[in-house]
Amino acid sequence: MKDVLERFLGYIKVDTQSSEESDTVPTTKTQLEFAKKLGEELKAIGLKDVSVDENGYVMATLESNIDKKVPTIGFIAHMDTSPDLSGTNINPRIVEKYDGQDIVLNKEKNIVLKINEFPEILEYKGQDIVVTDGNTLLGADDKAGIAEIITAMEYLINHPEIKHGTIKVGFTPDEEVGKGADHFDVKKFGADLAYTLDGGGIGELECETFNAAKAKVIIEGRNVHPGSAKNKMTNAVLVANKFINMLPENEVPERTEGYEGFFHLLSVKSEVETAELNYIIRDFDRKKFEERKEQIKEVGKKINEEYNKEIVCVKVEDQYYNMKEKIDEVKYVVDIAYDAMKAIDIEPILVPIRGGTDGSRLSFMGLPTPNLFAGGHNFHGRFEFVPVLSMEKAAELVVKIAELYANR
């Protein structure tokens, strides 16, 4: 599995950042270009039925080498990197045999990965770790996943003594902007179940995600010359502030954890005449999720009642649901991943995803898809890192899962 590092370092050289603003599919041309390169690589290692469609979805097949019928399994990762920080000119560095101290990422800018801020890195003392130069994200989310899947497929091709059923491979665009499953053709993919490799640290096995919605709040004010504004002006900036303060101050990402939900204010655009607030709403529990959506609408209603006119409009749109609802119906998909980890000396860590993956939506599209670790930490930022051994073990895990299904 040693090839996984070389692959990963090659993939992150390609800028595949997705865009919140774009209406194209995929949202950036570089993703489509990268998809074509991956398609060529999949053909080169010997996969069959390789396709790259106009939307940037890559699919391929590793044919079964056994006679009996077993479930067709899929392995999926996404090609885009987060818009939160630049993915251009990524300049990675390998910290060999990490010594357990702070890591200076960029001496000139005094950017330091500090162990008191990111203590999880101490779990990898003595290992080789890939870090950034402090100017960009790393792209382990999710190019580590891509490298692991392709490395595992090549290993299975080169080791026919390892028995496996039919395996499908899929790479998606635009996961980071919530569109990864928009044009995913589940029927064409042809798997009975799948796994995304889009998780964090080694051992993570995730079969629960948030229920997710987004809310856009439009506030219509009225501007009047401030010298004669009494009883006439409606300042949308102040109304926006009122709206923000009417939601629970402690139910925000920075004050919640585990199974706790939140309202997250993403952006504010405001002036006297008009204001716009953009929120995301998250909760694991479906009932609480529905209550949160009603709660944010109710804030708008109360403000409208106070002003005795419709100055606030709240539009809520569901994004994805907790995949646990669907995965519980085929629990063996989690059990096999759990057993596979144990078989290769990894302690499984069953944790809820405080976020979403392509698997969230795919599970509701008829393809149950829990999430496996890809190995990285601190995604979407300059402090992102990935231990080399974690990537190697993720590739080994893919092989072992395929083997266990063949032996069911």
Swiss-Prot record:
Keywords: Aminopeptidase, Cytoplasm, Hydrolase, Metal-binding, Metalloprotease, Protease, Zinc
InterPro entries: ArgE/DapE_CS, Bact_exopeptidase_dim_dom, Peptidase_M20, Peptidase_M20_dimer, Peptidase_M20B
Coiled coil: none
Gene3D superfamilies on file: 3.30.70.360, Zn peptidases (3.40.630.10)
GO cellular component, one term: cytosol
Localization (cell): Cytoplasm
Principal subcellular localization: cytoplasm
A biological process from GO: peptide catabolic process
Cofactor(s) required, per the database record: Zn(2+)
Residues the record lists as binding Zn(2+) 2: 141, 176, 380
Positions that bind Zn(2+) 1: 78, 141, 198
Enzyme nomenclature, EC number: 3.4.11.4
Pfam families membership: M20_dimer, Peptidase_M20
Function according to Swiss-Prot or TrEMBL: Cleaves the N-terminal amino acid of tripeptides.
Family assignment from sequence similarity: Belongs to the peptidase M20B family.
Name of the protein: Peptidase T
Record organism: Clostridium botulinum (strain Hall / ATCC 3502 / NCTC 13319 / Type A)
Source lineage: Bacteria, Bacillati, Bacillota, Clostridia, Eubacteriales
Gene (name only): pepT
